[in-house]
Amino acid sequence: MDYPDRVVLGENEVNFKKPIIGVVCDVIKNGANSFHGAGEKYINAIAHGANAIPILIPAKTAGEDLKSLSDFFDADFFGQLDGVFFPGSPSNVEPHHYGNEKSATPDSHDRQRDGSSLPLIKLAIEKGIPLLAACRGMQELNVAMGGELYQQLYNHEQFIEHRENKEADRKGQYQLAHEVSLTANGLLANILGQNSHQVNSLHGQGIKTLGQGLTVEAYAPDGLIEAISCIDESSFAIGVQWHPEWNFSQDKLSTALFKAFGDEVYKRFMQK
C-alpha cells in the first residue's frame, strides 16, 4: 500500500507518517558484552515489504544489574504500536514454558527474549495489534497460547530434515527446501491465492501440540505444522515456520504476506 505524504482535512493540512511496527530483539552475547538486536533482513522486510517504520523492542532485561524493561515498556506504550513482528533466531524457547522440565539443547536459549516475546504476544492479541511471526517467532506464538514444541525434530523418524545445510553458503542455506500445503480457505491461502508453495527450511524444532485459539494454516509434506493463525478474526496474528523475510520481494508468498501484514497495520494506524 502506498501512503500519501500528507492528508488534507478541510482547510487544514496534516503531516502524514507511516505506521510503526515493533521488532522484538534477541540478546547477542559477544564475550563479556551483550547486545540487543534484530537481523537486517527483518528490518528491510518490515520497512519495504510492510511499508512501515521498524523500531526495535529490547529484551525484557538488559542485564542482572539493570532494571527490567517492563518498568517503562508497559502495556500502554506497547498499545501505541501499529504492529509487532517476532523474527527468527538461532535460540530456542526454554522448554519449561511449555511443560518440559529438561532441555535437549541447554546452550541454545535466550531467556531474556522469552521474557519479552511470550507476554507481548498475549498483549498484542488482547489489544488487537496485528502480529506476524517467523520461525522461532511462530514457535513463540504457539507456546504463548499454551502449545507444546518438539525439541529435536531430527530425532523423530516421521519427519524429514528441516534444518539447513551447515556446509552451504548463506544463499544455499536459504534455498527452497520443500512444499507446504495451505489450508483451503484459510487466511494464508486467501492471501496467496493458491493452495501450495515452496518454502525454505532452517529449524530444528517444531509444533507438537497446537495452542488454544490457534488454527493450522499450512503443513509440510511430513505432516509438521508450518503455519498458524489466530481463530479470532478481529485479531490478525499469523506465524510461519519458514523465513519469509529472505528475498521477500522476489517470492510470491513472502511479498503477499508482508503486504497483508502491512495492510492490517495501516488499518490500525488510521483508526488512531
Positions of PLM-derived features:
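N-terminal beta1-alpha1 cap of cysteine-dependent amidohydrolase-like domains
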Residues: M1-L132, V143-G147, Y154-L192, Q198, ...
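Conserved G/P- and acidic residue-centered "switch" motifs that form tight phosphate/ATP-binding loops
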Residues: C135
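The feature captures the ABC ATPase H-loop/switch
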Residues: M138
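A short, structured beta-strand/loop element
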Residues: S234-F236
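Active-site-proximal beta-strand elements of phosphoester/diester hydrolases
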Residues: I238-Q241
